[in-house]
Amino acid sequence: MDCRSFYLQIAGCITAEILSCQLRPGQQMQSIRRLSVQYRVNPHTVQRAMDKLKREHLLEKCGQRLFITSDRELLRRSRQQEGARLVGAFLEDMESLGYTRTEARQMAQQAVPPSWR
């Protein structure tokens, strides 16, 4: 269960879509109203998520419209930071389950699918 505020969850979903290139650099975002219907929340909640992404420079405002940033270097750095955050969260979770660092590393290596080797 995700205990974060709805606007943070929405911002996280959109960030994941941006960093995985499901949303492309320069692509126009859907309207606040359309996103509020999609996420089943109040438009103000979506607006807060969009404001957060603008502060992080993942979204750019042009007139009344929002676009995914075209700054590929920013996107590359953001993707690396998110990857590091996910690895850190994995290691913390493994530690909370009682695994040693060595055991966690071994399990991670064993879980790598052959197509990644």
Feature map (PLM): residue ranges:
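Extreme N-terminal segment that seeds HTH/winged-HTH DNA-binding domains in transcriptional regulators
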Residues: 1-29, 33-37, 78-117
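A general secondary-structure boundary signal
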Residues: 7, 43, 51-54, 66, ...
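N-terminal helix-turn-helix
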Residues: 28-61
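Minor-groove-contacting beta-hairpin "wing" of winged helix-turn-helix DNA-binding domains
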Residues: 31, 64-71
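A short, flexible beta-alpha/helix-coil linker loop
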Residues: 73-75
